[in-house]
Amino acid sequence: MQDFFANCATVLQKYGFSYLRGAGTTLLLALVGTFFGCLIGFAVGALQTIPVDKQRDPVWKRVLLKILRIFLRCYVELFRGTPMIVQAVFIYYGLLQVFGIKMGMWQAGFFIVSINTGAYMAETVRGGIVSIDPGQTEGAKAIGMNHWQTMVHVILPQALRNIIPQIGNNFIINIKDTSVLSVISITDLFFVHKSVVGALYTYFESAAIVMVIYLTMTLFASYLLRLWEKALDGPQNYDLNTTDSLAYTSGMYNAPDPNHESQNLDMKGGAAHV
């Protein structure tokens, strides 16, 4: 056990900065990929839920939406049904060999994580939109909003709050799954681990260090996401005024405290007297 900690100290002394730089690369890939993946997911999810009226919509619109939905469905199933490491090899090496399309490592990395996350987020967003009470859409139409105004101002803000846990889950998954991008030579945390092992042959020690770093990043990300959820929930220490005694009986509201009310009246009376 002493040799283990001594070896870990030696590895950190020689390659500590490389581990930190690799962790920074991993976080950057996960953060940027999740952000653009969410944008893709919101766009795809919103497009998949465009309503079609067979009586009012012209034929060309119905045909166009049908083709669009088939294309989006193929995109979602393709990138959800294949491993990210295979996608990375196909996009970075395959496109260059077959079509002559050359992408830089960073461009390919961001692109791969974004479109992969977008495929998962598309279904999440679609489910979040469908879960919203249809009365919200009907009410928006009643005041003259069209479909896109309803989506932007009414539906999507509520859907966003409902799918925050899944956004956080995808971010944490991306922190771990970006390790596969070492196959295209991106110097993330796992790439650094392989380099250290190749130099020192400290498989167990280097793997332990990398696991601790990954665990620290995911736990910190989970904590920040919980804070974000609480911030969106707003304060929980207020009660709405109501004169319906049944609301107090059912537990929907807390009954006002008479002592607290009398103290408030005394304070107001004292202030008025002064």
Q: Which role fits each region the language model picked out?
A:
Residues M1-V274:
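Transmembrane alpha-helices and adjacent helix-loop boundaries
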